[in-house]
Amino acid sequence: MPGSAAARPLRAVKIWLGAIAALIAAMVLVGGATRLTESGLSIVEWKPITGTLPPLTDAQWAQAFEGYKTIPQYRELNAGMSLSEFKTIFWWEWSHRLLGRVIGLAYLLPFLWFIWRGHLGGELKRRLWLIFGLGALQGAVGWWMVASGLSQRVEVAQERLAIHLTLALVIFAAIVWTLRRLDERPVGAVPLRLRITAAALLALTFVQIFFGALVAGLRAGKLYNTWPTIDGALIPSAERLWFQEPWWRNLFDNHLTVQFDHRMLAYALWALAIAHAIDAVRARAGAAARGAVWFAAALTLQAALGIFTLLYEVPIGLALAHQAVAVLVLMLGVLQLERLWPRASASAANLPKSAMAAASRN
């Protein structure tokens, strides 16, 4: 059939994008472990090429350790650390950076091959170039984040950490969306309000992830370890929430405000997800109804993990599970919005004209 002939070149593209999405999800978890083990400042230089190799000799290890000793984190928090202890945190950060390099090559080399083979249409090619540009920007943002903790601070700036994580998941979401748009699937007739609420859910998920990263960067999860109360009340006093000047700094620097915002956003997101699921089921929206239920279920699990992570003062296992399910929730949100979003023919949008013409002659 012409349609299947035209879609054949996209099979390899689908496998490639699926692998990249999986690698980014793994990268987010390794990054989370790097943060939780306080390993992110163990490498004080940014060497995109030569930094691929770790220290191989005793002299190289000693040099790397001496570099770490020059930053405030070592002097104020880890003075007296042994070389073997340094190696533990070094390997986490090195693995995180290596995985970033692997993702870059795993994306760029097949992408160039697909372009050379003429497998990509203009619209798909432009979208993939944009994703590549975001990936390059992410590398720079990663170093910008690390650099914030090398001179005066003992940790990276929490707002830079939040930007770094959010950008990684924007790239992940863009790849998942692009992958789904490669399939030929009709969009059934559903109420416009379902599309609007799905878009609101996805936007709110990104905002919640950003604030979750602020909580992590400030280590605010190790404070106010009660639920549902926080600082002894359901809603803390305005004097405690907004004492910093200018007022907007509280949104980024005030431990209480940041954690309170993260909680309130969670409640709003969960309530909207439940309403969306009920609405989709009542509208007999088919796959969209199932997607809405799955999203609400995953979000409920995520909320429970968040509560237990807080109550137990952020054990690494629970914290990583909380971060992993956040990626799952985001993916389900992307899938739900894409499922409801209008679409053109996948082949027409993603294949080059030459491939479409060849298929039409078959």
Swiss-Prot record:
Compartment annotation: Cell membrane
InterPro entries: COX15/CtaA_fam, HemeA_Synthase_type2
TM stretches of this protein: 12-32, 102-122, 128-148, 159-179, 198-218, 264-286, 291-311, 314-334
Keywords: Cell membrane, Heme biosynthesis, Iron, Membrane, Metal-binding, Oxidoreductase, Transmembrane, Transmembrane helix
Keyword Oxidoreductase: yes
GO biological process terms on file: heme A biosynthetic process
UniProt xrefs under Pfam families: COX15-CtaA
Binding site for heme: 262, 322
EC number, UniProt record: 1.17.99.9
GO cellular component: plasma membrane
Self-association and partners: Interacts with CtaB.
Family statement: Belongs to the COX15/CtaA family. Type 2 subfamily.
Protein name, as recorded: Heme A synthase
Source organism of the structure: Rhodopseudomonas palustris (strain BisA53)
Protein encoded by which gene: ctaA
